[in-house]
Amino acid sequence: IAGNANKYYSYREAWSRIRLAQENGFYLEAIAIQESIISDRIINYLCHKQGVALLSNNNHFLSFSELIIKWRSEFPNGLLSGSYSNLIDTVNEWRLSRNKVIHAIVKSKPGEQTQSIDLFLEQAKEAAKVGEAIAREVCNWSKKNIRK
């Protein structure tokens, strides 16, 4: 394994955990790992492209939405990749559905019921399935474009 062996092993473990999490109904774990993969690939691309570390003013990594905004600034006309007409928009749409799912298990407006567990699990399963496909495409895109 050339280059960063630890990164390779981390990714191998991440993909394995995504698979196992989905097989066992732990969709939030899969979604969290997918976000980590997508963020890492965006950070890697932007650091190579812009030549700087992507840290906020308080020396923390930028939020997922902030990363997407910076990524979009590199591709103002969109980003065709694989079967996605605009990969950046697709990632951002998934981010929104991910946020909804992450908070949906117990969060509700005061006085309103939370959604049913069955509906939550259905939405979480779908977000994990979609997130895996998107994370794979972001990885594929990153491999092709990081060297340019």
Task: Please identify what each model-predicted range represents.
Residues 19, 24-47:
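Short, hydrophobic, well-ordered secondary-structure elements
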Residues 14, 38, 69, 92-97:
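Short alpha-helical segments used as structural interaction elements across diverse proteins
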Residues 42-88, 136, 140:
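Flexible secondary-structure boundary motifs
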Residues 78-148:
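Charge-enriched, short contiguous segments at helix-coil
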Residues 40-48, 70, 97-100, 104-107:
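Amphipathic alpha-helical interaction surfaces
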Residues 13, 29-32, 59, 66:
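Generic recognition of short, well-ordered alpha-helical interface segments
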Residues 14-17, 33, 116:
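Short, hydrophobic/aromatic alpha-helical segments in well-folded domains
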Residues 1-28:
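Charged alpha-helical initiation segments
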